[in-house]
């Protein structure tokens, strides 16, 4: 997959578009978003990550960049991070079932465990002709109830929920993965942590009346 790894920032319109043109986020149950969120609900900055579990650039971000952002911003109460499924079905045949697995895991409060396992073993399941059995084994490794998981995966509402998220992402302007909405701006690409730091520091300062300079630790 040759995803675009360029910076695309549209400050001032992105978040409005996300909330008004993508009713998915307003309609999604708070409990569903909470199970796919990290950080305090009262954090001054909210980031919506739109991602595809079969996207290699999303894997890179999840493993190389996100841990540092979590340490600096999420665990310190500055940022709330919300994961939104945006499967690129024309490129990744297993992106939809992987996304469905994550939604079902979220119902058992196991979203982030499955999130990490899907990216960790992406190179194993991505080339498979049928990834379903492997996904079930990942869910078992995450400690999920197999009975509840299978029932959720068979439920037509799970596919509808995933499709609604993808449609909402498209209406909001996302066209590649990973993509991020940061309090009014759209950022696209698995960019270096320094790019995120510059933006998050500036947005946090604007929201709290502080400075945009964070001491390096």
Question: What is each of the regions a protein language model found here?
Answer:
Residues 29-45, 73:
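A short beta-strand-turn-helix
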Residues 43-46, 77, 176, 183:
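Envelope-exposed proteins and targeting segments
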Residues 1-7:
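N-terminal secretory signal peptides that target proteins for export/translocation
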Residues 47, 114, 149:
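Divalent metal-coordination and catalytic microenvironments
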Residues 43, 51-140, 172, 206-217:
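Structural alpha/beta surface segment adjacent to cysteine/selenocysteine redox centers
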